[in-house]
Design a protein with these regions (language model features):
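Walker A/P-loop-proximal flanking segment of P-loop NTPase domains
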Residues: 1-75, 83, 193
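Conserved structured core elements
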Residues: 16, 20, 24, 37, ...
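Switch/connector loops and helix/strand junctions flanking conserved nucleotide-binding motifs
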Residues: 51-52, 77-80, 209-214
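P-loop NTPase nucleotide-binding core
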Residues: 55, 60-163
């Protein structure tokens, strides 16, 4: 008797369902992207269809990029989520050994993190949640708020990130397994930091569950 687990595969040689061609094409598209503007890539599918396996094969086929795995499972507040994200993002970049501007980059991260936490602690209005739903549906939206302090620190961080000559791939998997509030927080976070240069977000989720969760949070 043979038992099969639902654990995702780790590399292309383990693929028995013909997903490696798609994974390779997606990886090539990321590698060939020469722009510095950030990208958000959504990988949609029901639970168990192999989204994590595809992500693993995509990462396997990427050429020398900085990979950031962000798992937003344990946090107590939105400001805590921001803190965890920037710790993970900054540490992954600094540990890669590719950032020659380590000192100024670390300083820029700290300043921006403090500024964005101040803004994020303001009450969330319903219009913003509606915008998050539109974001999931693929509608381009402008940044929903600004302040001089936030603008200044963001511009400095963008300048430092622009000096890195590799793409930064931020992977957030299983978004649909989070609570409704956590799902809202994740998309709010992505909207806040989605315009950084050289950063590509790969988001994996069940689109129907996520859209329903955001609608329910809006009520």
């Amino acid at each position: 008797m043979q038992f099969n687990t639902d654990k995702p595969i780790q590399k292309s040689t383990e693929d028995l369902l013909g997903r490696k061609s798609f994974s390779k094409m997606l990886a090539e598209a990321v590698d060939k992207y020469k722009g510095t503007d950030s990208l958000v890539i959504g990988l949609f599918g029901k639970w168990g269809v192999g989204k994590t396996s595809i992500i693993n094969m995509v990462l396997e086929n990427l050429n020398d990029q900085i990979i950031v795995h962000f798992s937003p499972w344990n946090y107590s507040s939105h400001s805590d989520l921001i803190n965890l994200f920037f710790i993970e993002l900054s540490q992954s970049i600094l540990d890669s050994g590719n950032a020659r501007n380590k000192h100024t980059l670390k300083k820029a991260f700290l300043k921006y993190k403090r500024a964005i936490k101040v803004v994020s602690n303001k009450p969330i209005v319903k219009g913003m949640i509606s915008a998050l739903i539109q974001f999931v549906l693929g509608v381009h939206l402008e940044f929903l708020w600004s302040s001089p302090s936030l603008e200044e620190t963001r511009d400095q961080l963008k300048k430092e990130l622009g000096k890195i000559n590799r793409k930064i791939i931020v992977v957030i998997d299983d978004i649909d397994r989070l609570t409704n509030e956590q799902i809202k927080d994740i998309f709010q976070l992505v909207k806040q930091v989605a315009n950084f240069p050289n950063v590509i977000y790969l988001l994996s989720m069940d689109r129907e569950i996520v859209c329903r969760a955001l609608h329910e949070v809006q009520q």
